[in-house]
Amino acid sequence: MKWESYSHPISDIRDWNKNNRLELQPDFQRHEVWTKAAQIMLIDTIIRGIPIPKVYIKSVMIEGNTYRVVIDGQQRLTAILKFVQDQLPLKRPYSGEYQDMVFSQLPPDVQNEILRYKIDIHRIFRCAG
């Protein structure tokens, strides 16, 4: 198995999801298990600009289009996508200046910083066999 490492901004991940090019829950993935508090603290980490753990994906080409299957990182990506889609308000345990806000209520410069935040991704590109 070979891996390729690269970084993508959250805006790319949002676009992959919006265009149905991101599979968050393949058969081997568990369903959403993180608490709201854990999801909110991940968003707090991103707002502060602190790196988060890598995400692992497998890219699949279908009819010339790249689809991404999440191998590890589903809980993190789900929380991020919920936040940028205004489905996760910054409630407790978050206690910063954006308390109780959803993404679209944040100042535009903060929204842009979040969308530009880079997530390290390892992509499987070849399997032995």
Language-model features: locations:
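Basic- and aromatic-enriched surface patches that contact anionic nucleotides/nucleic acids
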Residues: 1-12, 22-129
